[in-house]
Regions:
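Conserved N-terminal ligand/cofactor-binding loop architecture of enzyme catalytic domains
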Residues: 1-56, 102-146, 346, 355-358, ...
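Donor nucleotide-activated moiety binding/catalytic core segment of transferases
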Residues: 52-65, 178-179, 216-267, 271
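C-terminal amphipathic helix plus adjacent low-complexity
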Residues: 118-123, 128-159, 298-382
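A donor-sugar binding/catalytic signature common to diverse glycosyltransferases
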Residues: 76-78, 82-87, 110, 243-291
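Conserved nucleotide-sugar donor-interacting segment of glycosyltransferase catalytic cores
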Residues: 58-112
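Conserved catalytic-core segment of nucleotide-activated headgroup transferases in glycan assembly
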Residues: 141-228
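Catalytic or ion-translocation cores adjacent to nucleophile or general acid/base/metal-coordination motifs
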Residues: 96-120, 278-305
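Active-site-proximal loop/turn and secondary-structure-junction residues that shape catalytic pockets
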Residues: 103, 168-170, 209-211, 245, ...
Length: 382
């Protein structure tokens, strides 16, 4: 590679395109995974340079490889390297391509999602319908199972509560979601003046438990941000770390308003009857049950107005819509393989030995693969 990237500025590297593909931007997602934070700065430029060089080699390889002779291409995730380059290149060349990754399961089982968009976005065709009594019961059971090992939330004051829920800042879903704010931390920074202005309210920060899970252990999480900024923030705040077992749903139930970045807590808050504002764009923010915004300015203006007017009311229709959306996401999109999954060490999995000879109650992919070859919908419900 003859190009001397050492002379490029950090911004030039971030926006560098090669043969119509923004390899600079696509590198950011994977670098975030390497450094375990969304805060990619100038001193990370060596990661960026090496990643761009790798992307160029992949694109040159694909141009000289007869991939058009294949009926379809399946790639993992679609947002991380090197698969994101393959995904983008196939789309640019009108090659049938889809992504796969672990999906959601209302049975809390191992599941596989197939999607024509990058699978971490979890985009699907939502049927805006009311759930049956049986479906509502299943959804309630799913949520209740998630809170079994939680400990009670006890507010230290009688002030009205505004809760703030973070996410795993460097997760692959963040790159495509962060188009209102540059990152989750920029959003948190912007909340400080509002917190200080509303001392009659208690602001409860809750770090995402995923920050503490072995496979997603975060080196700089919400708790670290809170500790580093504590001197700038008024005393009307408390923060629960990722390893704290406090019941997040109990926090929601005791809140007047929930502020989320892009986690599914946004959906669950509405289901529990608590109004929520989303600070990033994600798979559920354009459905209608949660408020989302095109810019940080619009977000902050709406938040201030909501707090000033105490506009915390929520329509039952939105609660029903959120429940319907969540149920469909959990049960009609991904394919369950729970019965043939065998857990190994460190979040690894394999198939049980008898998966080919014994009868298991799992979702089959025969028709799905035919749908893929015909470029038909890939969701389980089809």
């Amino acid at each position: 590679i003859s190009k001397n990237f050492d002379k490029f500025s950090y911004d030039e590297l971030k926006n560098y395109e090669y043969k119509g593909i923004n390899v600079g931007k696509k590198s950011l997602t994977t670098i975030s995974w390497i450094i375990r934070t969304s805060e990619i700065l100038d001193h990370h430029r060596e990661y960026l340079i090496n990643s761009i060089k790798s992307c160029i080699k992949i694109i040159d390889f694909l141009e000289n490889f007869d991939i058009k002779s294949f009926s379809g291409v399946l790639v993992f995730n679609g947002l991380t390297l090197p698969e994101s380059i393959m995904y983008e290149w196939c789309n640019k060349n009108n090659i049938n391509v889809a992504t796969f990754e672990s999906g959601w399961s209302i049975e809390n089982e191992v599941a596989l999602e197939l999607n024509y968009s990058p699978s971490p976005q979890h985009l699907f065709t939502f049927d805006d319908r009311k759930l049956s009594e049986h479906e509502n019961k299943k959804l309630k059971e799913y949520i209740e199972k998630k809170r079994i090992s939680s400990t009670n939330f006890n507010s230290p004051t009688d002030k009205k509560i505004i809760s703030i829920f973070g996410n795993v800042s460097w997760d692959t879903s963040q790159t495509v979601s962060s188009n209102v704010y540059e990152s989750m931390y920029k959003w948190l920074d912007s909340l400080i003046p509002i917190i200080n202005k509303n001392k009659d309210l208690l602001f409860v920060f809750r770090a995402h438990p995923g920050e503490y899970r072995e496979i997603k252990k975060t080196w700089y999480g919400l708790e670290d941000w809170f500790r580093n900024n504590k001197s700038k923030i008024a005393e009307n705040t408390i923060c629960y770390s990722a390893k704290d077992t406090v019941d997040s749903y109990q926090i929601i139930e005791n809140s007047e308003l929930v502020l989320v970045y892009n986690s599914t807590i946004g959906i669950e808050s509405i289901i529990f009857g608590t109004k929520a504002l989303a600070a990033a764009n994600t798979h559920y923010t354009k459905i209608g049950f949660i408020e989302s915004f095109e810019s940080a300015t619009m977000y902050l203006e709406n938040l201030e107005k909501t707090l000033f007017n105490k506009n915390f009311d929520l329509d039952v229709e939105k609660m029903n819509q959120a429940s319907s959306y969540y149920f469909q996401l959990l049960s009609e999109v991904a394919y369950n393989f729970g019965e043939i999954n065998q857990n190994l060490r460190f979040n690894e999995h394999t198939l049980v030995k008898k998966y080919q000879t014994s009868s298991f109650n799992i979702d089959r992919l025969d028709k799905t693969l035919i749908s893929f070859l015909n470029r038909d919908p890939l969701e389980k419900k089809y």
